[in-house]
Amino acid sequence: MENEKKSGDKYSKLAGNTLIFAISSFSSKLLTLIVQPFLTYAMAEISDLGLSKILSQYANLLIPFVSMGMSNAIIRFGLDKGNSEKQVFTNGLLTILGGFGILVLCWPIAQFLPDMAQYGLLIYIYVLMSCLRTLCTQFVRSRQWNKLVAVDGVLCTVATMAFYVLYLVGFKWGANGYLLAIISGDLSSVLFLMFTGKLWNYVELKGVNKDLWKQMLRFSLPMIPAQISFWIINASDLFFVREMCNGLDGRDGNAWSGLLSTGYFLPTILTTLGLIFYDAWQLSAVTEEEGRAKFFTKIFRTYSSVLFCCAAGIIWLCRPVMHIMKSNYYYAWHFVPFLVLASTCSCFN
């Protein structure tokens, strides 16, 4: 009887965490679902949207190197009650600042990369703010302040949407405005978590625990190749399409990248489900120890069934849904079935 109760508690806890993270993650992904049609009208040309996506993916490629994969270590070591919360947070912060310092030193070389000379400053700020926001949200999650995570997700979504409207519709800043809106949204999130969670109390620069730091790095550094692999799977196609399709059907490379990124609009629903579940699963996978094999098997079967049903529905509805985009983006529906299949496989990773 007692074992059944404990088993039920495990499922209830996972369901509760999933619901809380759904509020947080769904709000941020809802932003993507709302913003993508909005961007097709706010951007003057398809190529402007394509360039914006390319620039943001430059930043996303740099993030694992700057953070050194520390976001994973924050959860792993933050949940371990034997570690000092202050040391975990401080080590994560110092790692990110050190990684960003190395990135700054690489500027003389980085400026010669495509688009970097014109947009490099914004890309660098984007990387730093994204790393800091991830640090704060992961630490708050490791403290199991899950409701605060949910509120932060909603706040960041609203703030970013407001900045999109301000920079793209009000100031008409194009690609610059797109990057600035994301930067401003991340900054809003960092400030909110800092003040509500009083995270400055967890910064302890004196007596840094170097042994713990080494353990965290040993855990996080092997994650970098995995994160880069995810980037290659999910984002490198934008760069290949830009170079290989340049001039095809009278469109430049950025325009084709813009169409492809619009095609990601519906598969984002699948990746959203996967990310929501993964955030909750991280906690249960670490904290639940009894009956793990049966628990894991049952959850995987349910998870895979939901994914396959959603994938089939998205492919069925892709053409009519694409009518909500600006008319010259309708061609993007051709990409959707292939991207849905790829997203389904990615969710199982």
Regions found by a protein language model. Give the residues of each.
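Signature of the first transmembrane helix
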Residues: 9-71, 103, 107, 126, ...
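Interfacial transmembrane-helix starts/ends
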Residues: 15, 53, 83-97, 217, ...
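Transmembrane helical elements of multi-pass membrane transporters/channels
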Residues: 17-32, 156, 178-197, 210-283, ...
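Alpha-helical transmembrane segments and their helix-entry boundary regions
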Residues: 21, 49-50, 87-88, 119-122, ...
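Helix-loop junctions and terminal segments of transmembrane helices
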Residues: 37, 66-82, 263, 267-293, ...
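Helix-loop interface residues and adjacent transmembrane-helix termini in multi-pass membrane transporters
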Residues: 42-46, 142-143, 172, 254
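Interfacial segments at transmembrane-helix termini and the short loops linking adjacent helices
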Residues: 46-47, 110-126, 251-254, 314-347
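Hydrophobic transmembrane helix module of multi-pass membrane transport proteins
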Residues: 94-229
